């Protein structure tokens, strides 16, 4: 990892013991993010996206533990930090916006007091008037009109989109360098989703923080990300710039994800879907985790885990299809000439686009 990175994760593995066995939630994951960059981690539910990001903040469930690997953020070895040290880093070095704002907020405390608590924790020595001023500043920053009046209201007075703005204000109270956004729009309707994504993107440019999105929505990825990590079975299986992953995908799982986009469906034909189910992470996975669902699987996929093969200096994929000895396969028809297909959708006013 040669860039001047703000966050570097190397060979990280996270296990969760249970009565049914040990869940290998994250398996030998490496990635890096530069200052001001936007990384999107994309994949199906249960692939390890959220647990990976919670590992970086050391907010793992009680039984979960990092069994190998290192995490370096802003020059610090996070894996060696104590809980006391982590409490000082959470909110300042990194912060998180969770999926459901209703459960992230206390229903019995006014919004203003909840934001004020976040301010006082991360900015010691402020007077009561200064804290109040900062609360109003944050509420204004995230687009909440009439902040003086609304600071006195409770979470149930707000819509889902406005609650997510309140959560975002709390997340930004400590001026973090890294913001994790864990499915921040899943609980919202489509028009509000677009507003929240646009707001985070604008704030990221204004405040210069790094953003890591956790999502299964490829439309979000296309519109906001600089780099993409495609996850499957607890691993990143393809990593590159958003243009490389969307327009030159190399892993069969990435092919399948893109092929299943409704926007690429052909009228009168059945939409593509990925058959089978994701692997159980209780078991030791042999070979390529995607092999049982992969219509292009080779014999070696069931026997030996593939390494990362470089496609370019910034693009890597964990598939035996990139081995020089592998047969040459054409991509599925749905994702051939994907750049032109997306451009046509954009020209017609479609919501899905790559900037």
Name each model-derived stretch.
Residues 3-5, 145, 149, 241-348:
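Short catalytic/signature loops enriched in Gly
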Residues 44, 58, 180-184, 188, ...:
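P-loop NTP-binding/switch modules centered on Walker-like glycine-rich loops
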Residues 65-77:
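Conserved ABC transporter NBD signature motif
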Residues 76-77, 129-149, 258:
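Conserved ABC ATPase "signature" region
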Residues 173-177:
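A short, proline-enriched helix->beta-strand linker immediately N-terminal to the Walker B motif
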